[in-house]
Regions:
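Bacterial N-terminal signal peptides
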Residues: 5-14
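Sec/Tat signal peptide C-region and signal peptidase I cleavage site
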Residues: 15-19
Length: 362
């Protein structure tokens, strides 16, 4: 959006139709059909104290991978709750969450824990959206439905230097007696970053989005349902002049082209009204337009997910025509058939930590 005024600085499963679970078990729609009998049994994978005591947590040593859940299907994860006690700064960036479906060795979810819940700069703040929320105090919640037919395995790895003193978790899932519908798609979440983005000093035109910041790339059939993103400004000025661009099924030019970063995240005019957090969109952290300032934003396409039958490349410009070199951190969320394309390698832990990169200093 061009400013007109100065503003402050899932593999499709082939179960027989006669043995399918209802759509309601997959939907997760609150208060929908509460008067009707359910066709699932609610189960929970949890850190509770098996001795009957009150030590309802796990510790995680440096380098250790803790299995949070390893359950047979069919089922649907309906809610994930986590809270963490750790002495280490930026532990939200140093703990890595992974989720695997159907015995795959390549994770369908791979992201630092904080980033998965929209805390992309490694610090806690409170907000409430429909699929994700952070409650008081430091309570991380996900309500994304995550179906699995044969197996669901979730892990967390401590890539920090300090022992996690307490990692509490509850993973609620619906154990099903019948197969999932044949067109069921699997949940995916992918972390990306650019620290910094590479500024392009060209003619101010960007038609094909070659140098855009990429949220995700996928092959197969599925639909994109949203993104959380955090920005650290490396120079004064407005970071969000860049347009969102979605390339569906190999299109060379954007299938969907936006008008500005704050417009995509459903704000306007540089988010000048201040921070906000709504059910499907928000900017819960809004800085000034100055070097070193931090921003966090999110958008969920729950009304009309962006569909693809072969491939999708979801991206956004970093500044107008990619003319800025700020630091971007993001997690994209989507559903698709399995197998999925292997994700890019997760950056080393030290590279994931927010730090200022002034122009000319890198």
């Amino acid at each position: 959006m061009r400013r007109l005024m100065l503003l402050p600085a899932l593999l499709a499963l082939t179960a027989p139709a006669r043995a399918q679970v209802s759509d309601e078990a997959l939907s997760g729609a609150p208060m929908a059909r509460l008067t009707q009998a359910k066709d699932y049994v609610l189960r929970r994978a949890s850190s509770y104290d098996r001795t009957g005591g009150n030590a309802d947590y796990r510790t995680i040593a440096p380098g250790e991978t803790l299995t949070l859940m390893d359950e047979a299907g069919p089922g649907v994860i309906s809610h994930v709750w986590i809270t963490i006690a750790s002495p280490e700064a930026y532990h939200l960036k140093k703990l890595v969450l992974r989720m695997y479906w159907e015995g795959e060795t390549s994770p369908s979810v791979e992201t630092p824990v904080g980033d998965f819940f929209g805390l992309g700069l490694g610090n806690y703040f409170l907000y409430q959206a429909t699929p994700l929320a952070v409650g008081s105090d430091k309570a991380l919640n996900s309500f994304f439905p995550m179906p699995f037919q044969k197996q669901a395995r979730n892990t967390v790895t401590n890539e920090g230097r300090e022992k996690v003193a307490a990692y509490y978790f509850n993973i609620d899932y619906r154990a099903l007696s019948k197969a999932l519908p044949a067109d069921t798609l699997y949940f995916h979440a992918q972390y990306r970053q650019a620290t910094p983005c590479k500024a392009i000093k060209g003619n101010g035109l960007n038609v094909e989005g070659h140098d855009n910041y990429v949220w995700m790339e996928a092959t197969g059939r599925g639909h994109f349902v949203g993104v959380t993103m955090s920005v650290m400004e490396n120079a004064d000025g407005w970071w969000g002049e860049g347009d969102d661009m979605f390339f569906v099924d190999g299109d060379k030019k954007p299938s969907i082209n936006g008008t500005g970063s704050e417009d995509y995240f459903l704000g306007a005019w540089d988010f000048s009204g201040g921070p906000f957090a709504y059910a499907w969109f928000g900017a819960p952290v809004r800085g000034l337009e100055l070097a070193g300032e931090r921003w966090s934003v999110y958008r969920f396409h729950l009304d009309s997910p962006i569909t693809f039958t072969k491939s999708l490349r979801a991206s956004i410009e970093h500044g107008h025509a990619n003319d800025r070199a700020d630091d971007y951190y993001s997690v994209a969320y989507w559903y698709q058939t399995e197998p999925h394309a292997v994700f890019p390698a997760l950056p080393p832990v030290e590279e994931r930590l927010p730090k200022l990169h002034p122009p000319g200093a890198h």
